[in-house]
Design a protein with these regions (language model features):
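C-terminal segment of N-terminal export signals and the immediately downstream linker at the start
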Residues: 110, 143-181, 194-195, 202
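A short, flexible N-terminal coil/short beta segment enriched in small residues
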Residues: 127, 133-137, 141-167, 265-283
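Non-catalytic terminal accessory segments
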Residues: 1-156, 422
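Amphipathic, alpha-helical segments enriched in basic
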Residues: 3, 7, 54-57, 61, ...
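Short, charge-rich amphipathic segments
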Residues: 28-38, 126-139, 163-172, 200-212, ...
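Soluble catalytic domains of enzymes that build or remodel membrane lipids, polysaccharides, and related
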Residues: 170-422
């Protein structure tokens, strides 16, 4: 999305947020009205307005200075995240107040209908709002408020290890027990804590897998974003190699370039960075992984996604691959698997993807698995199988736009391939 789109969307959000302020302010007045200290009441009420309006003004000022050549910086993402946090908190607070006010409306209407001939001249139609309603509103709104703040300060670097064993009837015997570490969606332009990123890399290194793969979106927009972290991500090594592909953000499509030549040079620089990192970038091509005299094919395509750039050419990538070979495909967007790969004439045993981030927000427990991204992507995180073809969608290593994660934590995937009996 370009600068104009960001400005329109977030100015609308900011305007609605400001309109909510008067309602929340009114609710807070009810909450503090019995306090003996007038000074403390003023601190709470005007402190709220100062924070709410201040964050909105800072964000709008940041958007107005947003560079079309760089896109959103960590500062812009922080301001956006604070604005979203306050916006959702105010909505939750206002909804609780609204429920109480609707009750007041019905009570007032009923009281008027029954006692209209007995009403005093200056008797108010609405009964006064009870302090209890404001107290409930504060308690309920505190849940998302503290949750989002946790996601911004800690959750976005709270790396989780997801280990899965995948079974295949036709896995070559030599690859029985073969391990793969996958990370995806690094989005290096959003990072703001090198030490925290290093902890994630150390966790990935500690797995000592046979193969390492990265499934796209090294940067948000421009090749220079990864440069401060080259020394860190180059630490990821594996005995059978490190392989990578491009994601939709790697092409630089979301910021302005002075010329096509400049944009092309940026992409070439990004490809060079993959080489410097020690990653073999697969651009609609394949390689053979050999172990114990047996082989499997690792295939990588450029980005192909529903509603996104569709540069990936699976037919080209499959050229030279033995039709009977065991095949693993790296494809950034899981919609490629949904629309093309699972129906492909030649069986591709396993596809590894990312892209969705799991929306960076959701719930994953033993009995409940939900994220708003499920309404956009059928396969938004984890494992899926259909027609004997398996898919794994990584939840992402980094974050984008919202500078945080809540419930859907950054992921490092370790897959163990096992041969199952026919």
């Amino acid at each position: 999305m370009h600068r104009g789109g960001f400005i329109r969307i977030f100015l609308i959000i900011a305007s609605i947020s400001l309109l909510l302020d008067w309602y929340v302010f009114n609710g807070l007045q009810t909450f503090v009205k019995d306090w003996k200290s007038i000074r403390l009441r003023r601190i709470v009420l005007w402190g709220y307005l100062l924070i709410s309006v201040g964050v909105t003004v800072l964000f709008v000022a940041g958007v107005s200075s947003l560079s079309t050549a760089k896109g959103m910086t960590p500062y812009h993402e922080w301001m956006l995240s604070l604005l979203i946090t306050l916006f959702i908190t105010k909505i939750i607070f206002s909804l609780v107040l609204l429920i109480g006010d609707i009750g007041r409306l019905f009570y007032g209407a009923g009281n008027y209908a029954v006692n209209r001939n007995k009403r005093k001249p200056n008797e108010p139609f609405f009964p006064a709002r009870r302090k209890f309603i404001s107290e409930v509103a504060i308690l309920v709104a505190a849940v998302p408020f503290t949750g989002f703040l946790y996601g911004m300060f800690k959750g976005k670097y709270d790396y989780k290890l997801h280990k899965h064993t995948l079974y295949f009837e036709d896995l070559p015997d030599a690859f029985d027990g073969f391990t793969i570490t996958q990370i995806s969606d690094i989005h290096s332009g959003s990072f703001d804590n090198r030490d925290a990123v290093q902890r994630g890399i150390d966790l990935a290194k500690a797995q000592k897998s046979d193969l390492f793969v990265f499934t796209g979106d090294l940067v948000n927009n421009a090749a220079w974003e990864i440069e401060p972290y080259m020394d860190m991500f180059s630490q990821l090594k594996a005995p059978y190699g490190q392989f990578s592909i491009l994601g939709n953000h790697d092409y630089g499509d979301y910021i302005h370039w002075d010329s096509d030549a400049e944009k092309k040079a940026n992409l070439e620089k990004l490809k060079e960075h993959h080489r410097t990192l020690g990653y073999r970038l697969l651009l609609d091509e394949n390689v053979v992984i050999e172990k114990g005299g047996q082989k499997m094919s690792l295939i990588g395509v450029q980005n192909w996604g529903r509603g996104f750039v569709q540069k990936g050419d699976l037919d080209k990538a499959m050229k030279g691959v033995d039709k009977d070979a065991f095949k693993i495909l790296l494809s950034h967007d899981p919609t490629h698997w949904e629309e093309k790969v699972r129906y492909y004439p030649e069986k591709i045993h396993l596809t590894l993807s990312g892209h969705t981030h799991g929306a960076q927000f959701g719930v994953e427990t033993a009995g409940l698995r939900w994220s708003p991204v499920k309404y956009v992507y059928l396969d938004w995180a984890g494992w899926m199988e259909q027609y004997g073809r398996q898919l794994y969608v990584n939840r992402g290593f980094g974050f984008l736009a919202f500078s945080g994660r809540l419930g859907i934590w950054p992921e490092i995937t370790v897959l163990t391939l096992k041969k199952s009996k026919v």
